[in-house]
């Protein structure tokens, strides 16, 4: 069975990787789909192309995982790709309430099912926005993201990391 794991992945975190790795064991193939919204274009830290490359690098060790992108309704992508199951990771009850609403809508308008996978407890506090915030101050994000994301974030905030390193050397 082939499934889709959608998200903005700006950037992919260790929590995403945890859910992905477990989904890859449960299903024949997982397509990581970077959803991009033209109305949110200025809000992304990484461009679509950068996010796709980070995902490819982070998932290259998983033979049954591929990377794609789409800029419309997820149910339209699912129909276009002939896929019927969405994978969503959950960190807390608050995620569940939101995701349940979306799952019901996806089922109603696109006849698509959603499978929820609970993130491991150690990743329940990690989000892409928190990782971006920590990285923007030069903080250590190495445990919170795969190596590909950490490298990309350090490049994006190279001046901050260089300044932080310089102050440590003094």
From Swiss-Prot:
List, alphabetically, the NCBIfam families matched: coaD_prev_kdtB, cyt_tran_rel
Pathway per its UniProt entry is: Cofactor biosynthesis; coenzyme A biosynthesis; CoA from (R)-pantothenate: step 4/5
Q: Predominant location of this chain?
A: cytoplasm
Where on this chain does ATP bind? 8-9, 16, 89-91, 99, 123-129
Q: Which residues take part in binding substrate?
A: 8, 40, 74, 88
InterPro entries (alphabetical): Cyt_trans-like, PPAT, Rossmann-like_a/b/a_fold
Q: Could you say which EC number(s) this protein's record lists?
A: 2.7.7.3
Record text on subunit structure and interactions = Homohexamer.
KW Metal-binding (keyword) present: no
Task: Note whether ATP-binding occurs among the keywords.
Answer: yes
Q: Which Pfam families match?
A: CTP_transf_like
Task: Please list the reactions this protein catalyses.
Answer: (R)-4'-phosphopantetheine + ATP + H(+) = 3'-dephospho-CoA + diphosphate
GO terms for CC? cytoplasm
Q: Which GO terms describe its molecular function?
A: ATP binding; pantetheine-phosphate adenylyltransferase activity
Per its UniProt record, the required cofactor names are: Mg(2+)
Q: Which UniProt keywords apply?
A: ATP-binding, Coenzyme A biosynthesis, Cytoplasm, Magnesium, Nucleotide-binding, Nucleotidyltransferase, Transferase
Q: What is this protein called?
A: Phosphopantetheine adenylyltransferase
Instruction: Output the GO biological process annotations, alphabetical, semicolon-separated.
Output: coenzyme A biosynthetic process
* Localization per record: Cytoplasm
According to its UniProt entry, the function of this protein is described as: Reversibly transfers an adenylyl group from ATP to 4'-phosphopantetheine, yielding dephospho-CoA (dPCoA) and pyrophosphate.
Site (Transition state stabilizer) at: 16
Sequence similarity: Belongs to the bacterial CoaD family.
PANTHER family recorded: PHOSPHOPANTETHEINE ADENYLYLTRANSFERASE
